[in-house]
Amino acid sequence: MKKSGILNRHLAGAIAELGHGDTVLVCDAGMPIPPGPRVIDLAFRAGTPSFAEVLDGLLDELVVEGATAAEEIRDANPDAAALLDVHFPWLEAVPHDELKARTAAARLVVRTGEARPYANVLLRCGVFF
């Protein structure tokens, strides 16, 4: 049994399969998920696990070279916007409809229990060297 890091076997396995340039959407409980991407649904109850908890856990294990969020996050969810600013000062902001469209090409979607709007970020995987 693993003793640290991401313990969810499905999520840990999906992370191990990611390569350079693959995209991962970390999303709130309300984000529409199109058919296509592999989905790991971690939502348990409204707010659990939170967007911040899941994002922090993923960032401990992923190399990220790009991140995209909906521009609407700034007004609708300042706490989540501030979290993304800390992790990704170079964050790309696009209209929410464009973020939803890009989700169709994601390799992986990790759905959280987050119940605040626009708590979504599309991560582009980098390489560790």
UniProtKB/Swiss-Prot annotation:
Keyword match Transmembrane helix: no
Pfam family, one: RbsD_FucU
Any Gene Ontology CC annotation: cytosol
Catalytic residues, chain numbering: H20 (proton donor)
Keywords from the UniProt entry: Carbohydrate metabolism, Cytoplasm, Isomerase
Coarse class of the protein's main subcellular location: cytoplasm
Keyword Electron transport: no
Entry's Gene Ontology molecular function annotations: D-ribose pyranase activity; intramolecular lyase activity; monosaccharide binding
Catalytic activity: beta-D-ribopyranose = beta-D-ribofuranose
Entry EC number(s): 5.4.99.62
Pathway where it operates: Carbohydrate metabolism; D-ribose degradation; D-ribose 5-phosphate from beta-D-ribopyranose: step 1/2
Residues noted as binding substrate in the record, renumbered to the chain: D28, H96, Y118, A119, N120
BP GO terms, sorted: D-ribose catabolic process
Localization, UniProt: Cytoplasm
PANTHER family in UniProt: D-RIBOSE PYRANASE
Summary of the function given for this chain in its UniProt record: Catalyzes the interconversion of beta-pyran and beta-furan forms of D-ribose.
Quaternary structure and interacting proteins, as annotated: Homodecamer.
Similarity section: Belongs to the RbsD / FucU family. RbsD subfamily.
Name the UniProt record assigns to this protein: D-ribose pyranase 2
Organism: Streptomyces griseus subsp. griseus (strain JCM 4626 / CBS 651.72 / NBRC 13350 / KCC S-0626 / ISP 5235)
Organism placement in taxonomy: Bacteria, Bacillati, Actinomycetota, Actinomycetes, Kitasatosporales
Gene: rbsD2
